[in-house]
Amino acid sequence: MTSQLHKKGEAWSARFSEPMSELVKRYTSSVFFDKRLALVDIAGSLAHANMLAAQKIISADDLAAIERGMAQIKGEIERGEFEWQLDLEDVHLNIEARLTALIGDAGKRLHTGRSRNDQVATDIRLWLRGEIDRIGGLLNDLRGALIDLAEQNADTIMPGFTHLQVAQPVTFGHHLLAYVEMFSRDAERMRDCRTRVNRLPLGAAALAGTSYPIDRHAVAKSLGFDGICANSLDAVSDRDFAIEFTAAAALVMTHVSRFSEELVLWMSPRVGFIDIADRFCTGSSIMPQKKNPDVPELARGKTGRVNGHLMALLTLMKGQPLAYNKDNQEDKEPLFDTVDTVADTLRIFAEMVAGITVKPDAMRAAALQGFSTATDLADYLVKRGLPFRDAHEAVAHAVKICDDRGIDLADLTLDEMKRELPNVAQLIGDDVFDYLTLEGSVASRNHPGGTAPDQVRAAAQAARAALGK
């Protein structure tokens, strides 16, 4: 009977009086997307088999046969020779059926003391743990590229913006290091998420545990888990670890999207702060002159894709009673695509950032517009005893006058400045123009976290040192 069931692929079919329809088979099968879990499924099965043998639940001969068969199956999968079958429903039954075909009854004993419920939960955690580590490395690569570019531009002055209006001068290096901070927090979130992913569900079986004398801690140790899931119902039924990862991934993409928006803006001919290497751009099928920043534009769009996956997983879980439900089969495609999208995006962005051409003259010209040193003039007056609100009002008046005349504050002569600001004329000296230069403005922000070039260089060094931790 069992052999026939394995041949048919329906490990549960003895309970039913008619076979599943072909349409339902296609509808319920997951093998053509969950087969990417195959290698971690094999790793989990080998750890389980070793534990079963150590606990005298299966024989040493069975274990040797299982290890031999799994080695062959792993090779077939890696060479692309493994034949995946829709009738076998999922990655687990495909591998088990092939194992049984290779080694006979020993293959049928592998599933002793476990269910596909705890098996798949283990597979996902094993796989996701590896992907979190990979994404952490890719975040480091992007941070490193940003730090390199920031160090090269510690003295490059550009306008800082609020409300997309010129606000105060900053250095381009300081601006880039803001994204280093964001991606550093993303890396921290990934590491923190990993601690909750790295718990072993195996041993929970279907939902209640198993009557066999298993050793869950031994399996956890052999697979590199930090410990076991403490409750069997929770172990098989919840996917909060996948949701948490996807939320962290959505934040990664949100930061990428913000950076992308600025890259698109900076590359626009009307701004012209940077150029992106040709290999990251496309042209137009009708307009010969076009060079379009497709990579950052697509990254903005793909952020919505990852956000959608987060909502899909949250919605998937919100109405499920304990314990396992078939709904959970729908966790894999959003999770897989999130990993692929984030990993591809980070890898491309690290390469793209390294190839950015900076245009300092355009940045400086933009910083000279929009009265970006107005706050410096107000600070100058405050340091001479004027209350800040009064200084703010006086400088706002001066800005209005200059705006009407189409000139900058620095274009006023000392006499003109005193004449236009009679209430504070006695506070204004020849040194006022030192405060109205772009270099003087950024140099004055010489404190940790400030935009002064020396602080930017120090922050870049600290950020680089943090990459090694």
Curated annotation (Swiss-Prot):
It is found in: Cytoplasm. Keywords: Amino-acid biosynthesis, Arginine biosynthesis, Cytoplasm, Lyase. One of its GO terms (biological process) is arginine biosynthetic process via ornithine. The keyword Aminoacyl-tRNA synthetase does not apply. Signal peptide: none annotated. Its EC number is 4.3.2.1. GO terms for cellular component: cytosol. GO terms for molecular function: argininosuccinate lyase activity. The keyword Cytoplasm applies. It holds the Pfam family ASL_C2. It catalyses: 2-(N(omega)-L-arginino)succinate = fumarate + L-arginine. Its main location: cytoplasm. Transmembrane segments: none annotated. Pathway: Amino-acid biosynthesis; L-arginine biosynthesis; L-arginine from L-ornithine and carbamoyl phosphate: step 3/3. It comes from the Bacteria. HAMAP family: Arg_succ_lyase. Belongs to the lyase 1 family. Argininosuccinate lyase subfamily. This is Argininosuccinate lyase. It comes from Burkholderia multivorans (strain ATCC 17616 / 249). The gene is argH.
